Amino acid sequence: MTELEFVTEHRRYLHKHPELSLHEYETTKYIAHFLDDLGVPYERPLDTGVIAYLSGNSTHTIAYRADIDALPIYEENNVSYRSEVDHVMHACGHDGHTTALMLFVKRCKNLADKGELPQNIVFIFQPAEETGGGANRLIRAGAFEKYPIEAVFGIHVMPFENEGRVVIRDEEITASATEYRFYLHGLSSHVADKEQGHSCGEALQHVLTQVGQIQQYHLNGLKRNIVHMGHFEAGEAINTVPSNGYLEGTIRTYDVKDLEIVKQQMTKISESVKLLFNVECEVKFEEGYPPTFNDPQLRKHVENGLVNAEFEVIDKPTPYLFGEDFSFYSQIAPSYFVFVGVRDEAKGYVTGLHTSHLNFNESILIRIADYYEQILKSYSEVQSQ
């Protein structure tokens, strides 16, 4: 089997059988079976996901991570390997991430069998990147405590960059992602007796207006921030004063101070609702993913790896506003995360992440494995000096 046949077969199987965050049971079995066939030892610290390990000719250990979960999206691609799971799709490319790491495991096992693997390697097939914070769950479960990991590397496919280009950036490359929720509780009445109630309709309208102005009036316009209102509702009938209201959304920023400003303003908005509308209002925050921080000390390995794998390196001036739970790995070791271009206009592979038409050429997965291998060589050369 050629490497192109390998990545095509595995990627398309995974694409046809996507599973949501924390439900990647069959995906986990598939990866485990692959590792069993290779004779690569592994552990399963959580119900889903796999941590594999190979010993090399060194005391140094590095790690590579691929996320394995999918999204609740109905696939609209008209391809033979279209998702067979209703309203679940690998719309963020994690099937590709997983397959590229599988190929790299296979290469490393071949090196290890010949006594030529230069470093110890931890291969992280991580569950629940989209929701659930799988990286943090693994860390809290002690999955890496026995591995003296010195560096962690990861990638993400990027359909807005042409195939063959890779976006890198030192320090923050993705934003933090924090969810917020407003809960409003008033008093219902018939619309004809509106004065007898305390309407959450007008109160929610006030909240929407004020939240919508936070970015304009309280944050530095030169910085890239998002205060997004994703879902809101109030009331149940057209002739009733709404007794409840609800708003939820997300905050994206790569500046901790800006996040605190947004939280403070939302708290003030919540407090103002009681005074203006006699409606109880509470805002709650759910801390999501911190910014992904790329350690500048690892840049030389990343750049060497990309150039030697014949990628064009693009240095991004500002971070993406995506949330990415790879950020948690910086708690255990220096880490570096890059975005690999997969755009192919000739084939119509142009739609963004989290869309129903996301697709890419499987051949790019071989080049990602090449990049992983070149990082291994670069890191080994420095450690041997």
Swiss-Prot record:
Signal peptide: none annotated. The keyword rRNA processing does not apply. InterPro entries: Amidohydrolase, Bact_exopeptidase_dim_dom, Peptidase_M20, Peptidase_M20_dimer. Pfam families: M20_dimer, Peptidase_M20. Keywords: Hydrolase. Its EC number is 3.-.-.-. GO terms for molecular function: hydrolase activity. SUPFAM superfamilies: Bacterial exopeptidase dimerisation domain, Zn-dependent exopeptidases. The keyword Hydrolase applies. Belongs to the peptidase M20 family. PANTHER family: METALLOPEPTIDASE, PUTATIVE (AFU_ORTHOLOGUE AFUA_6G09600)-RELATED, PEPTIDASE M20 FAMILY MEMBER. This is Uncharacterized hydrolase SSP1352. It comes from Staphylococcus saprophyticus subsp. saprophyticus (strain ATCC 15305 / DSM 20229 / NCIMB 8711 / NCTC 7292 / S-41).
